[in-house]
Amino acid sequence: MTAETFFQLFNQYGLILVCSVVFCEYMNLPGFPAGVIMPCVGVLIARSELSLPLTVFLSVVAGVLGSLVIYAVCYWGGEPVMEKLFGRSKKFKSLVRKCHEFIDAQHGRGLAIIRVIPCIRTIVSIPAGLLRMPVKWFVGWSAAGITVWNTALISFGYFFSEK
């Protein structure tokens, strides 16, 4: 595949790919590290016909939707579902417990703050669901944090790429 063919494909399917990767990442599926992928997306956008603001917006929507899946599972499934999914990992449980305490102390803004901290930003949906945070708070604060994170990473790649 030539570089020209790759960019043509990215122009056609890039937004679908970006949204799919972001959605999966916020659902905590392994293999989707935003810290690596999002700056690369910015570079690709700079070299394509895609819009930076549209890409950031759609990545935020995909991130919120992916987060809502985990939030809903924990909201309605509670501790038994979390135990079933992550019961063996003491480190993971410890991170979730720390996020839980931080959100409980900081309320909604704690959720937005955690959304920009690598390694724990995607698991914050779990304690938010377990705490039964109101969905409008969850979506609002998640969108705020995800917007900051995705904008920073995609813009980094976009503005520091050689056009």
Whereabouts are the PLM-identified features?
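Hydrophobic alpha-helical transmembrane bundles that constitute the permease/transmembrane domains
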Residues: 33, 119-123, 143, 147-151
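Short amphipathic helix-loop junctions that connect adjacent transmembrane helices
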Residues: 37-46
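Residue-level hotspots within the lipid-embedded alpha helices of multi-pass solute transporters
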Residues: 26, 60, 115-116, 146-150
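Transmembrane alpha-helix interface/packing and boundary motifs in multi-pass membrane proteins
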Residues: 19-38, 113-114
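Structural signal for membrane-spanning alpha-helices in multi-pass inner-membrane proteins
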Residues: 25, 42-43, 153, 157
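Alpha-helical segments in transporter systems
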Residues: 22-26, 139-145
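Membrane-interfacial helix-loop-helix
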Residues: 1-20, 47-126, 130-139, 155-163
